[in-house]
């Protein structure tokens, strides 16, 4: 083991690799399932595919770059900054995709009769494009000047060096904590989290209200329709918990770094916080896809057709989304 890599770093790298090995195949399988099953082509699954694409990129690109940054190679300042920014872009896209799915589920409960007229594939595509554009804006903001270049240049000049600074590439050396806390956390992480709390509370309220009133829905069976939506809402509550569990620790540590520079942060806490954020990408296929029967049946067909060489029966596109025991 190279002397520059500590035991904590080695453990961190191993966990990151494990997360990537789970995240990439799991999310590729989600995308594959939508491709082969026509029943998974409505607007709802467009958002799930967008989330899966972001999560594949987290496992295939963000995690390798995070490992590179953790090792800390010697690079030019802007080279290191370019390595750090994709992490911000793709993790932000995951957050916005989660929010889009929450809003989509809210609309299914709020306007069940008009849902398909309001949430069309075209509008879903526009929403997805908007999420990605916002993610690039948020993630590339450090490239436009909100970074630590001035401080690094002062230290570089104080040593009598000329030209662009060469530094040990580490995330906190190039990315401003003011950006991470005031802009990234207080604007693009915390508000979506709070908004999702409100959305999920409203979803539960609407479902309970409709179940009590027994108002007819598009399915013609209010108990069945809203009972299914209640099960889905419980999944959303789990997603909310996992989102908070995955993202808040790292941002709390960033706040400590900014507001209490003298406070000691054990390295192991930083490593745990980082792989929790990446681990959220590995959780999503399990929480979203495996609770939907159409996905489960399609996964089984893919497995039998392509890995066991045993063709599965044709997919019944009229399968209900939820099993009775979910």
From Swiss-Prot:
SUPFAM superfamilies, alphabetized: Family A G protein-coupled receptor-like (SSF81321)
Give the positions of lipid attachment, kind S-palmitoyl cysteine. Answer: 309
Subcellular location per the Swiss-Prot or TrEMBL entry? Cell membrane
- Residues carrying covalently attached carbohydrate according to the record: 159
**Gene Ontology cellular component?**
asymmetric synapse; axolemma; basolateral plasma membrane; calyx of Held; cilium; dendrite; dendritic spine; neuronal cell body
SMART domains this protein is in? 7TM_GPCR_Srsx
At the top level, the lineage of the source is Eukaryota
Family the entry assigns: Belongs to the G-protein coupled receptor 1 family.
- How is this protein named in the record? Adenosine receptor A1
Gene giving rise to this polypeptide: ADORA1
